[in-house]
Amino acid sequence: MKFLALVSVILIAYGSAWMKAYSLSEKYFAYAEEQYSKGNLITALKGMNKLELRIEDEYFGGYQQVLDTWRSSTLGPRPDAYYQSLEKPKQIIEQLNKQQLMEFIEIYVQLDSRYVPTAADQLRFLAKQSGDIALYEEMTEFLTEAFPRYNQREI
């Protein structure tokens, strides 16, 4: 009897945690989709800038937060929002122009470097394409020094 009670408590706790994560990621996904449709690509990817929020403001994440919520999940199903978010970072980074990529790198290299190497590699690609050899070399050096394990694409 005690065993069944313990199992019930564990299942209820897990179910409650799963529902909370599901609800939060659905909210983040809806916000990310809205920002994406408005052309606010970096906000769609990274969510709201937490440094600009006041205490009473509600935080809304982006595709990154949806992915982070479910990435290490081993039990239970992942929601559709997770699978729909998987390709968004690459799609968004490939849509950014040189100025947006540079701003992205400058802002997030210190705060949260996820996707910074990908953005720097895309900036390398655009620099090479436009003949901006100085920027190409700068981004190559940046990637080599700051992210030595990142595999730069052949350009």
Predicted segments with their positions:
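Hydrophobic membrane-insertion alpha-helices, especially the h-region
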Residues: 2-20
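Structural signature of alpha-solenoid helical repeat scaffolds
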Residues: 16-20, 77, 110-111, 131
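Hydrophobic/aromatic side-chain positions at a characteristic register within alpha-helices
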Residues: 17, 24, 29, 36-37, ...
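Alpha-helical membrane-targeting segments
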Residues: 20-21, 26-27, 65-71
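Short extracytoplasmic/periplasmic juxtamembrane "stem" segments immediately C-terminal to an N-terminal membrane anchor
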Residues: 28-48
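Extracytoplasmic/periplasmic/luminal assembly and interaction segments
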Residues: 36, 47-96
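Sec/Tat-exported extracytoplasmic proteins
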Residues: 40, 52-55, 130, 147
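Non-cytosolic head/periplasmic domains of membrane-anchored proteins
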Residues: 82-155
